[in-house]
């Protein structure tokens, strides 16, 4: 009887350990990584107020939808970045949806301290134009669970 209980305990411990292991992360496809890197470079340029880099990264026919639903264009976006973003603005949890070999949506979450709402879901559409990735469209959606946060 003792042997059976010991064997059963060993099986249970082994099964528990096996199930508690987190699965290894899947490698990010090269296409997705390229777009995530492009998105991060764009956000870093915006934080650093590198307006020349920001301007180059945005397509001339860019359109965006603001948190309140208003439409805006390239000039509005570049002008808004002149004021700067809080230095502790964070972007995380990047996901890429490939549309074609030359276009994709990069969705991610963003925290902008001091802004209302400070928690946002971002969706940026990138297109390869003349061999360069450029931002064509952006939609900003407030994170509903935090839309009324006053900070």
Annotate each language-model stretch with its function.
Residues 6-16:
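Bacterial N-terminal signal peptides
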Residues 19-56, 61-151:
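A beta-strand edge to alpha-helix "cap/lid" segment located at domain peripheries
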Residues 1-4:
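Positively charged n-region of N-terminal signal peptides that target proteins for export
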């Amino acid at each position: 009887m003792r042997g059976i209980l010991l064997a059963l305990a060993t099986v249970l411990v082994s099964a528990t350990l096996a199930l508690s292991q987190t699965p290894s992360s899947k490698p990010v496809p090269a296409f997705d990584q390229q777009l995530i890197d492009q998105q991060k470079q764009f956000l870093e340029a915006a934080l650093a107020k590198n307006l020349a880099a920001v301007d180059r990264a945005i397509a001339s026919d860019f359109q965006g939808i603001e948190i309140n639903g208003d439409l805006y264009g390239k000039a509005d976006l570049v002008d808004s970045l002149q004021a700067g973003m809080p230095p502790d603005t964070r972007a995380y949890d990047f996901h890429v949806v490939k549309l074609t070999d030359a276009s994709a949506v990069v969705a991610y979450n963003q925290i902008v301290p001091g802004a209302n709402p400070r928690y946002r879901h971002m969706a940026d559409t990138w297109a390869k134009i003349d061999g360069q990735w450029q931002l064509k469209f952006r939609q900003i959606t407030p994170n509903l669970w935090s839309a009324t946060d006053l900070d």
